């Protein structure tokens, strides 16, 4: 089976990265053909798939990435054209890569599996903590506006606005069809 793994980082940075690297190794050991898609970072492990990795972005361009930037879409489509996966496995893809990959794969009839390593689909801040220390479930009802009121993202109105917009764009209803 041809399996495409996606994660924003392709090096041992955190639990999601270690999980994906171990999964890649395990899938290959069981005879699957595996491709990877990640952001282009100097710390990345070497891979023949790095030519498809979107380049790191300026702070100005960072505003477009959560919504599926042109570069992410074009490099990802090229990888889909060249590799032709049977299944795509998303991991930690929010912000830098974005869930747009699930839509693009689904449009081509590619099955999509997504391992959620955090609470991003429930909470724009990822961790369900108000100000980093109080458990918060305010956004669970689907209304993410509390993110703006509480400046949940880095204590910043601007970062919280981007987090809010990302949560509104990539809502459950939009993603569950993938």
Located regions from the model:
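Catalytic-core regions built around general acid/base machinery
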Residues: 100-108
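N-terminal subdomain of nucleotide-sugar transferases
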Residues: 1-42, 81-83, 107-111
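Membrane-proximal helix-turn-helix segments that form the acceptor-binding/catalytic region
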Residues: 107, 120, 135-178
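Short aromatic-enriched loop/helix-cap "lid" or pocket-rim segments at secondary-structure transitions
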Residues: 17-18, 45-50, 101, 124-129, ...
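Short N-terminal targeting/anchoring amphipathic segment
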Residues: 77-97, 110-115
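Short, well-ordered alpha-helical microsegments
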Residues: 20, 96-99
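A short, histidine- and acid-enriched strand-loop-helix "catalytic/donor-clamping" loop
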Residues: 116-126
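A conserved catalytic-core segment of Leloir-type glycosyltransferases
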Residues: 25-87, 128, 143-150
């Amino acid at each position: 089976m041809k399996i495409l793994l996606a994660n924003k980082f392709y090096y041992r940075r955190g639990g999601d990265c270690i999980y994906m690297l171990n999964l890649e190794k395990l899938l290959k050991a069981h005879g699957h053909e595996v491709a990877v898609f990640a952001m282009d970072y100097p710390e990345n492990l070497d891979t023949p798939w790095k030519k498809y990795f979107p380049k790191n972005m300026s702070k100005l361009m960072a505003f477009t990435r959560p919504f599926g930037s042109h570069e992410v879409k074009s490099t990802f489509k090229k990888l889909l054209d060249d590799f032709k996966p049977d299944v795509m496995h998303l991991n930690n893809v929010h912000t830098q890569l974005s869930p747009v990959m699930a839509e693009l794969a689904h449009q081509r009839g590619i099955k999509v599996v997504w391992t959620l390593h955090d609470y991003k689909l429930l909470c724009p801040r990822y961790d369900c903590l108000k100000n980093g220390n109080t458990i918060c479930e305010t956004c669970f009802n689907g209304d993410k506006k509390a993110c703006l009121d509480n400046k949940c993202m880095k204590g910043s109105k601007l970062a919280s606005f981007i987090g809010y917009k990302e949560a509104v764009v990539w809502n459950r209803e939009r993603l569950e069809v993938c």
